[in-house]
Amino acid sequence: MRTSNYLLSTLKETPNDAEVISHQLMLRAGMIRKLASGLYTWLPTGLRVLRKVENIVRQEIDNAGAVEILMPVVQPFELWEETGRSEKMGPELLRFTDRHSRPFVLSPTAEEVVTSLVRNEISSYKQLPLNLYQIQTKFRDERRPRFGVMRAREFSMMDAYSFDIDKEGLEKSYQAMHDAYCKAFDRMGLEYRPVLADSGAIGGSGSQEFHVLAESGEDLIAFSSESDYAANIEKAEALAPTEEVAAPTQEMELVDTPNAKTIAELVEQHGLAIEKTVKTLFVKASDEVEADIIALIVRGDHELNEVKAENLPQIASPLEMASEEEIRALVGAGPGSLGPVGLELPFIADRSVAVMSDFGAGANVDGKHYFGINWGRDVELAQVEDLRNVVEGDLSPCGQGTIQLKRGIEVGHIFQLGNTYSKAMNCNVLGPDGKSVILEMGCYGIGVSRVVASAIEQNHDKFGITWPDALAPFQVAIVPMNMHKSERVKEAAEKLYAELTAMGIEVLFDDRKERPGVMFKDIELVGIPHTIVIGDRSMDEGNFEYKNRRTGDKEAIAMDTVIEHLKAQLA
């Protein structure tokens, strides 16, 4: 490709609204342009990378035995009503009506559509197992699109759906897709980890996320220091403490704390150790309990894990905190003065809270706290659950080592759905005994456009992007110095360009009338792995200059061996 025929569109300055490095570099390298909030046009350079990700994913998913189809982006709303997800998805599900007032949605995912397809096309166990996938545009009406294509409203996604006659078959399909994901991300040159995950709105019995490790990641990943255990912090279990509850050493005392409305203020002003305090949070209860509000109690230095709380049957889903007005109407005090003593509401305590003694908590009166609280003596402990986020140094749930935390960007997710959708949509076949069997489903997604941004988060320097070879928009750049003034430079560049392209090597030939410095900066910014510089001075010595983008190394290469050198670098 000649730059004279190409839309390179690089920018010198970083746009003000670009927060993370991938967004900044995708704009500066001319990969994308913003059309509206969360909506982007993919320019030629970005599209070349996107297609490379798609092709690697397609090859590995094909190798796993899946079959490609293409489903509509526009879906009938009635399918979403069949599964009950029309409300569960909330405002992220963009709804509209056509000219005949028929309701539709823009596809955020395709479980309903593919299940509808299979129930009409498959009738016998002999047609199974079946795994169907597509690479298609998706739309989710994000409340706050940010980080460029990392969290956009419109995005490219590979979504696959497996159908099996039984759970054993589902597990085989699931493992095959897990392995295909690993092969795809390995080929892309990404540092990633598969981690245990919560199934969220998709549902099902088990799932794993695939995270590209990056400091800018929105998710925290918990790892064991001594095993392969890894889980999203939403899923990572905080084990019950092994120590016994210590005997009381203090009497419970009501203390005036007029200026302590937070745990931090309580600790600072009254000299308590933060691990000797608890915070009490009021949340909306589900229909499982008679009360409208239920209290959750966690240690003062721990954070409530909202996903764990939401998964408890007593808690309304989605999790909703009680307002200050609701709290005051119930106990007559504000959120900073709540505690378990004398509380006439059901409450659930975290495992770490259950072994505390001589601790401090709000007295359910503004400006007052109880110190020296002990379970049994001062307040009865009823229900205990895992409510908190794990922290570094916790024992690993696998029983080996301790927890370490790193940030990750979710680029893939696989689910064992079971019969959640097939049962709701009456998707069944005749089994070997002639009886009707509800199919077992799996679903699998890779955020193709998000992979592009994630790769940049892992592969960049102060000059621009340092693509892994498999994802680079071009393999080789040719930079001819002053070719419009030097005929022999032009001839050498044209000859090399013709030879490389004839070999199927992807080349960007910078034939612009630009200063060499501008050309070099653009090539570095875009991140082309291998550059050949052709100039009169080096040609006088019978050489071209080779530069490796990732290492920055430069070397003189004999003109008649440059192709062999490049072939070795690209091997």
Swiss-Prot record:
GO terms for molecular function: aminoacyl-tRNA deacylase activity; ATP binding; proline-tRNA ligase activity. InterPro entries: aa-tRNA-synt_IIb (IPR002314), aa-tRNA-synth_II (IPR006195), aa-tRNA-synth_II/BPL/LPL (IPR045864), Anticodon-bd (IPR004154), Anticodon-bd_dom_sf (IPR036621), Pro-tRNA-ligase_IIa (IPR002316), Pro-tRNA-synth_IIa_bac-type (IPR004500), Pro-tRNA-Synthase_IIa_type1 (IPR023717). One of its GO terms (biological process) is prolyl-tRNA aminoacylation. One of its GO terms (cellular component) is cytosol. Pfam families: HGTP_anticodon (PF03129), tRNA-synt_2b (PF00587), tRNA_edit (PF04073). Its EC number is 6.1.1.15. The keyword tRNA processing does not apply. Its main location: cytoplasm. It is found in: Cytoplasm. Keywords: Aminoacyl-tRNA synthetase, ATP-binding, Cytoplasm, Ligase, Nucleotide-binding, Protein biosynthesis. Belongs to the class-II aminoacyl-tRNA synthetase family. ProS type 1 subfamily. Homodimer. NCBIfam families: PRK09194.1, proS_fam_II. Catalyzes the attachment of proline to tRNA(Pro) in a two-step reaction: proline is first activated by ATP to form Pro-AMP and then transferred to the acceptor end of tRNA(Pro). As ProRS can inadvertently accommodate and process non-cognate amino acids such as alanine and cysteine, to avoid such errors it has two additional distinct editing activities against alanine. One activity is designated as 'pretransfer' editing and involves the tRNA(Pro)-independent hydrolysis of activated Ala-AMP. This is Proline--tRNA ligase. It comes from Vibrio atlanticus (strain LGP32). The lineage of its organism: Bacteria, Pseudomonadati, Pseudomonadota, Gammaproteobacteria, Vibrionales. The gene is proS.
